[in-house]
């Protein structure tokens, strides 16, 4: 089972309630996930390197983190936003979202050089997500963590799929997908 590590207080903030650990474990059980570990970056660093001094340990965050095992088919739960949304829906605090595919006013073109990519990754899919903000560093870090979890799990350590994300506002079209020789 994949595991997602979430800041407890941030999760409770998104759920709109502070739970005791027992209450949260029960919520996890009822929802179908398992609270696997309660830790912190500080505790992990301390456990992994017994030789760290108190001064060296000061740089590690002591915020409580929950490591939650999620079912292998629930990739939406591998980030703070997905877990919080799913739990809020389960608790009846939020309705299931409805997403709409919108035709763009201007289409962008991706050129695929299939001669170089067919043997390595024969498929290429692109999407533009608008209205996404990464101003909150927690959201950006969660997004990067989700991308990494997907790479490690469903993408089979990038052997099947590699996900690239780019800020379209900082790029100029023409886009080309091709395979380059290793350096």
What is each PLM-predicted segment?
Residues 1-183:
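RNA/tRNA-interacting regions in translation and RNA-turnover enzymes
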């Amino acid at each position: 089972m994949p595991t997602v590590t979430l800041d407890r207080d941030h999760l409770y903030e998104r759920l709109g309630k502070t739970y005791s650990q027992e209450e949260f474990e029960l919520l996890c059980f009822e929802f179908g996930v398992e609270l696997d570990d309660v830790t912190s970056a500080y505790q992990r660093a301390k456990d992994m390197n017994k030789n760290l001094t108190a001064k060296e340990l000061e740089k590690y965050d002591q915020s409580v983190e929950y490591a939650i095992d999620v079912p292998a088919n629930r990739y939406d739960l591998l980030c703070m936003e997905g877990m919080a949304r799913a739990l809020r829906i389960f608790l009846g605090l939020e309705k299931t979202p409805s997403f709409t595919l919108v035709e763009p006013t201007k289409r962008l073109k991706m050129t695929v050089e299939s001669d170089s990519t067919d043997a390595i990754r024969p498929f290429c899919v692109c999407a533009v997500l608008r209205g996404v903000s990464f101003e909150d560093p927690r959201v950006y870090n969660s997004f990067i963590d989700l991308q990494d979890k997907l790479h490690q799990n469903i993408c089979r350590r990038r052997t099947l799929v590699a996900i690239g994300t780019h800020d379209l506002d900082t790029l100029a079209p023409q886009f080309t997908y091709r395979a380059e020789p290793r350096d």
